[in-house]
Amino acid sequence: MTKKTKYAGGRRVVGAQILGTRQRVSLQLTSLALLSFLASCVTPKDVQHHVIISVKDQKLALLDRETLIAIYPVSTSKYGLGDWRGSFRTPLGELEIAQKIGGGMPPGTVFKDRIRTGEMVLPNAAGRDPIVTRIIWLRGREPQNANAFGRDIYIHGTPEERNLGLPVSYGCVRMSSNDVIKLYEMVGLGAQVTIVDAPLVEVVPGLANGTQVASIRRGGTFVH
């Protein structure tokens, strides 16, 4: 079988060579388009917000560029502090927001294994204690909390709102549905989360000496 040839600029060019060149150019263009698409999908890390959780106070403070903008009541573990698997304890130290789940879902939406069950639970429903409304999944950044992501340590909504301010969880940080929705909408992936066994006044810049506002207006009420 004789190969077809073409003449370009006085040179003898084999047809198969032209086809191969076109395929390589097409592949390169496809690769560039794919890289551009993937780059557009990357969510910038949230370096603006900082969440500080005080186990001592059972409160969560949200800072925007180191300025306090909100304080919410929370519940940490009834079993105390720690990070070993199966301990049901709340880890200490520096963590970050790894994933956010449940955006747009109505308050009280029940999640099991981070998947909606289709059930809704009202606040303080008798005998019910599922994960509801929003999930903010945390990843540890230090040896003392290296297991946090694998242990499914979340900031999440709880129907047991009457117990907020008390350590009653199984390791996660619980919030009311309304509060976790607000937090979810403000913080992004990669935002710093610090969990401490100390009062907020010792760790929030300026809170102790009054340069930060110690009480934040939230939904018509003050959170102290």
Annotate each language-model stretch with its function.
Residues 69, 73-105:
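Electropositive
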Residues 38-40:
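C-terminal motif of bacterial Sec signal peptides marking the signal peptidase cleavage site
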Residues 46, 84-89, 105-224:
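Exported/periplasmic cell-wall-interacting domains
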Residues 11-12, 22-24:
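Basic polycationic patches enriched in arginine
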Residues 16, 25-28:
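Short, low-complexity intrinsically disordered segments enriched in A/P/G/S/L with frequent Arg
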Residues 3-4, 17-18:
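Charged/polar low-complexity intrinsically disordered segments
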Residues 42-80:
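A structural motif detector for short, solvent-exposed N-terminal "entry" segments of globular domains
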